[in-house]
Amino acid sequence: MARLQQHYREKIVPELTKQFGYTSPMEVPRLTKITLNMGVSEAVSDKKVMDNAVADLTKIAGQKPVVTKAKKAIAGFKIREGQAIGCMVTLRGVQMYEFLDRFVTVALPRVRDFRGISGRAFDGRGNYNIGVKEQIIFPEIEYDKVDALRGLNISITTTAKSDEEAKALLAGFRFPFKN
């Protein structure tokens, strides 16, 4: 069992039950999945860039990502239908908690000029999105072996019914919100 998973069961569930007045522990919001998505626009002209992006995301997530392909052709972006334009990986269970632990305790403090993450990036249904500008904040990525700095989007999906519940859940996981 992951460290954060145990922390969730022992500390967060009782706190949230008390705070929001849940009658059953099954009502307490929990993390469903974490999705890491990396859009690679340079892959249109150079196929090797996609391999490097997949390798980076594999190191970060600990599992192999799936290559996302264009649904439609867009002439303005020189994209053809079915062409590889990004990669994504969905984490669930123990891997999800392990990634979240590394992200909050190791990766976020390595962000330049870090003052906390925004508390406004919730979608209204209890899910949270955060964009990372550089993949080198993760300790798995070696700075010398990076060909280009690529950003990625991290989507945290929860069972929370409101943003307030989701924020309390993520704050329980020690997310450093600035407001």
Curated annotation (Swiss-Prot):
It holds the Pfam family Ribosomal_L5_C. GO terms for molecular function: rRNA binding; structural constituent of ribosome; tRNA binding. One of its GO terms (cellular component) is ribosome. GO terms for biological process: translation. It comes from the Bacteria. Keywords: Ribonucleoprotein, Ribosomal protein, RNA-binding, rRNA-binding, tRNA-binding. Belongs to the universal ribosomal protein uL5 family. Part of the 50S ribosomal subunit; part of the 5S rRNA/L5/L18/L25 subcomplex. Contacts the 5S rRNA and the P site tRNA. Forms a bridge to the 30S subunit in the 70S ribosome. This is one of the proteins that bind and probably mediate the attachment of the 5S RNA into the large ribosomal subunit, where it forms part of the central protuberance. In the 70S ribosome it contacts protein S13 of the 30S subunit (bridge B1b), connecting the 2 subunits; this bridge is implicated in subunit movement. Contacts the P site tRNA; the 5S rRNA and some of its associated proteins might help stabilize positioning of ribosome-bound tRNAs. This is Large ribosomal subunit protein uL5. It comes from Paracidovorax citrulli (strain AAC00-1) (Acidovorax citrulli).
